[in-house]
Design a protein with these regions (language model features):
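Cell-wall polysaccharide-cleaving catalytic domain and substrate-binding groove, primarily
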Residues: 1-148
């Protein structure tokens, strides 16, 4: 690829910064899925939306509200060094593994950024794009500290 996109991390190339595996018919998927393992999205905002949708499912369906339980499900030991991932995220967002996160942009934006950084070795997105994708995911979900 002449524009250097082939040198970008896989998740950034695929517009899937959470490295979400194929299997769900996500909104915003590219018409051509060129990666045999991971989803390819039309635009990064859709990959960010999918990442946040998963985190909201963890919160509201599986009652995962702290970094330890969220990352243990996101990056299970069968595929990852889960403890190192948890440590990385906790340092990035300055919380302890069992600190409960509020269902708010103030808590989830840093979490999403740290997941993207861990998955790709970088976090190249502006906050505005991240927030747009996150709010697309939040449609229909409650927000705020009382939302569990």
């Amino acid at each position: 690829m002449a524009n250097g996109i082939d040198k970008l991390p896989r998740g950034i190339r695929n517009k899937n910064p959470g490295n979400i595996k194929l299997g769900t018919d996500w909104d915003g998927l590219a018409s051509e899925q060129t990666d045999p393992t991971f989803c390819v999205f039309k635009e990064s905002v859709w990959g960010i939306r999918a990442l946040m949708k998963i985190l909201l499912t963890y919160r509201f369906t599986h009652k995962k509200t702290d970094v330890d339980s969220i990352i243990s499900r996101w990056a299970p030991p069968s595929e990852n060094d889960t403890n190192a991932y948890i440590d990385f995220v906790c340092k990035e967002i300055n919380v302890k593994p069992l600190d409960k996160l509020d269902n708010s942009i103030e808590h989830y934006l840093p979490l999403v950024k740290s997941i993207i950084r861990m998955e790709n070795g970088q976090q190249p997105f502006k906050d505005e794009l991240l927030v747009e994708g996150m709010y697309r995911a939040w449609e229909g979900y409650p927000t705020g500290s009382s939302a569990s």
